[in-house]
């Protein structure tokens, strides 16, 4: 854990202002655990934002306006154990995420397991939000902190150190949500936002979602 009593901002894009019961109960458990560890915790939600890239960038802006040490993205439909966030903190990585499954069944994996005579087919049904490094395939060894390096991980459950965004600020475009100005003062009605999260096309021609784009951006500028 980088800071002795870290300050954490939990950020949840919440389109339509809705979350699942699993998320709500998980958040209560996490709050209790973090409080017992003397972590100062804030919760920020962004409701009724249909564009996820803009939503995540706005939440990152809110984070940078605070004095928090960590930005913890958690999607509104994620269920997680109460010690999951402390586990990420203990890993002490610049960017680290918890792996969660997609809303689909990996039938190819189930089929291979069945052909191999496996009996516990449910254990092979998950399709997870990550891409492994290079030619690692389906296997990688954990390091001393209990994590593995991946090429891409999901922002549905991702912890980011403040130093990451501070470093990237100089390498990304900025924008305003609108160009509207206050008619009385002439000031812009919305603040400048850094575009940490965007969609992009990588060098293989693959369209990257905003979380995978962020991973590529951080790796491009020396991160891991």
List where the protein language model places each region:
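N-proximal low-complexity "stem/linker" segments adjacent to membrane-targeting elements
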Residues: 1-50, 54
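Conserved acidic residues
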Residues: 41, 69, 94
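Active-site nucleotide-sugar/metal-binding loop of Leloir-type enzymes
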Residues: 57-70
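Conserved catalytic core of nucleotide-sugar-dependent glycosyltransferases
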Residues: 60, 81-199
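Short beta-strand-to-loop acidic/aromatic patch adjacent to the donor-nucleotide binding site
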Residues: 67-79
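Residue-level detector of anion-binding/catalytic polar loops
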Residues: 77, 94, 224
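Active-site neighborhoods of divalent-metal-dependent phosphate/nucleic-acid chemistry enzymes
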Residues: 200-209
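Short active-site alpha-helical segment characteristic of glycosyltransferases
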Residues: 214-217
